């Protein structure tokens, strides 16, 4: 059983997907499973996921026949997860190389039901200042 099941809803994010998956496959904690739910993407996202899954058996890809939205995609991922812990990552996110290892250490030292960790927003040109401020205020205690 994997220590951490990482669930990623994927919908039309071919531009960001490789960086996301590469950051997960390069984690210092290798005892992970990565469950990607391709939510009926119309771009090359599904093919990108299949290519990664063919090269690394920690990757599992579920292809939805029709778009079900982020929440239902996450629920589908949870039902297929085998890890001791479940982690959600969005398909345009990427993690520092030791993130999973550090999170697992925190979870074993401080048994909690939910762990939320710091976020850094690297906004592209299409993100308004209002949204940047909302994200910053949301993640700041």
Locate each region found by the language model:
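Nucleotide-sugar donor-binding/catalytic module of glycosyltransferases
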Residues: 1-141
């Amino acid at each position: 059983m994997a220590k951490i099941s990482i669930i990623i809803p994927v919908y039309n994010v071919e531009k960001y997907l490789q960086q996301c998956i590469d950051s997960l496959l390069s984690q210092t904690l290798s005892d992970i499973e990565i469950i990607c739910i391709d939510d009926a993407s119309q771009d090359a996202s599904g093919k990108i996921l299949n290519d990664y899954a063919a090269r690394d058996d920690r990757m599992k890809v579920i292809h939805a026949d029709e778009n079900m939205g982020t929440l239902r995609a996450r629920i589908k991922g949870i039902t297929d997860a085998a890890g001791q812990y479940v982690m959600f990552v969005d398909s345009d996110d990427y993690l520092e190389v030791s993130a999973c290892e550090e999170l697992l250490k925190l979870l074993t030292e401080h048994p909690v039901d939910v762990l939320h960790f710091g976020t850094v927003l690297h906004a592209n040109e299409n993100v308004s200042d209002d949204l940047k401020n909302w994200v910053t205020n949301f993640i700041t205690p």
